């Protein structure tokens, strides 16, 4: 899980979602998991 000031899709399988008011990226590739914070 990377915590970054701005999250971006890295590949076409990445999805940007909002969870508990946080913007997150989830993906099949676990290296692409990101959270904004």
Curated annotation (Swiss-Prot):
InterPro entries, sorted: Ribosomal_bL36 (IPR000473), Ribosomal_bL36_sp (IPR035977)
Disulfide-bond pairs as recorded: none
Pfam families registered for this protein in UniProt: Ribosomal_L36
Gene Ontology MF terms in the entry: structural constituent of ribosome
Keywords, in A-Z order: Ribonucleoprotein, Ribosomal protein
Cellular component, GO annotation: cytoplasm; ribonucleoprotein complex; ribosome
GO BP annotations, alphabetical order: translation
Keyword presence, Ribosomal protein: yes
Family note: Belongs to the bacterial ribosomal protein bL36 family.
Protein name as annotated: Large ribosomal subunit protein bL36
Organism: Rhodococcus erythropolis (strain PR4 / NBRC 100887)
Gene that encodes it: rpmJ
């Amino acid at each position: 899980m990377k915590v970054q000031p701005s999250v971006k899709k890295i590949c076409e399988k990445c999805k940007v979602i909002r969870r508990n008011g946080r913007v997150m990226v989830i993906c099949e590739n676990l290296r692409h998991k990101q959270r904004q914070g």
